[in-house]
Structures are given as structure tokens and as C-alpha cells.
């Protein structure tokens, strides 16, 4: 109960600030970069022990949304530049050839899994508007909450006993239904009352399914990473939630797939 209370307090403090960052494209870029500094540092720290080197790689990770959002039009351009920079830095600083591979592997995973995936919020915002970008974010919060309490009450069928023993099919179904209800209410307020375009009713189920499935596998994947490194949490950034990576693990899979779903249903979204 104390842990749940801590989680609620932390969320109550952090959530309003995060939502406010969606008021402009530039503030969203700043938010993504700030999150990448924390989550990227946590992930890279699991593999790299050299403190100065870790900071350099984290700076590269945080630069991606700035370069992609403000300088380059294609996402692969800054991605390639940052990857090559990281490889060259490793070749210069790592004395042991075997360490070069470990360093580049860790940096590559962080660059794709954390940086590239989270930065999909930028094209979602740019192509489909702030309301839909915020919907993607808040829907993961709703899914996590509904899945947690439903699983706590009715959870019987374990999805991944090896990596995430407490995650149940019943919890996922509860989270899915929660997202459907939330998306309906979100559209009712944002679209019908505020006259801001949000995904249409026919898109609710594909979107809710995307959130439920991708959030679940995002969480399982991060659990597998933590088991590999023998840690319970990725960090201690957010009291009650663990590290920043623990908080956004599902979101990292949800954001890119949601963008693809929106692209496929672009006529519906617009």
C-alpha cells in the first residue's frame, strides 16, 4: 500500500508537467530529450562502467530529437550521424577490442530501442497533431493502471512466467477495455467539445489493441533486459516506479506502432 501511495504521488507531480510539454512542438522536443537523458543513462549504465564515456553517449542520445525535430527532415540522417560518432568514439577510447563490440552494441540498442522509438512522438505530433500525440501517451498510462488493478484482482493466466511472472492475460484484457473507454471519453471531450481532431470511432479498436499488445511486449522486453543484467529496476529516478526506463518501457513499443497505425488509417484520422 505504501508503494502504491508513492507511485500515485510521483505520478501526480510528474504527469501535469509532462502534459504541459505538449503545448508546442519545441517543448515536446525538450521533453523527449530530457527523458532520453534519464532513460538512456540508465540503459547504458547497465553495460558501460566508464563514467565519462557514459555521459558522452547519453549526450548523443539526447541530441537525436533535436536534430530530427529541428534540422533534418529524414529520421535516418541524424540516426546515421550519431551512430557513426558513437562508433568512432568507442574506437578511440576503448583499448580492448572486445570492449568496443560491447560498447557499440549497448549504444546501438539505446539509440534504436530508447531514442529512435521514443522520438516517434515527433512525427505523430507533426503529422497528426498534439491531441493525438497526447492520446498515445495518456492511453499507455490508462492501460498500465487498468491492467495492474485488473490483474491484481482477476489475474490467473500468466503471459510470460520467465520474464514477467505477474503479467496476466486478464490484466491485458482489462487494460484494453480501459483504453477503449478512455479513448471514447477523450474524443468526446477533445473532438466534440473542443473541436480538435482526434481519431474517429472506427479507429478505436485498432488503436486500443495496439496499445494493449505493444505496451505488454514492451514491458516484457525490458524485464528480459533487467533479468539479463541481474537488476530489479533500471534506476531510482521515479520513486515508486523505479527508473525512467521502467516507466516508459511499454511506451517505447507503443509510439512507433501507433504512428504506423495512424499512417495506414490517415484518411480516418484526418
Curated annotation (Swiss-Prot):
GO molecular function, one term: phosphatidate cytidylyltransferase activity
One GO cellular component term: plasma membrane
Cell compartment(s), UniProt: Cell membrane
Enzyme Commission code: 2.7.7.41
InterPro entries, per database record: PC_trans
Record's signal peptide: none
Membrane association type: Multi-pass membrane protein
Domain of life of the source: Bacteria
BP GO annotations: CDP-diacylglycerol biosynthetic process
Keywords: Cell membrane, Lipid biosynthesis, Lipid metabolism, Membrane, Nucleotidyltransferase, Phospholipid biosynthesis, Phospholipid metabolism, Transferase, Transmembrane, Transmembrane helix
Protein name per its UniProtKB record: Phosphatidate cytidylyltransferase
Organism annotation: Thermotoga maritima (strain ATCC 43589 / DSM 3109 / JCM 10099 / NBRC 100826 / MSB8)
Gene that encodes it: cdsA
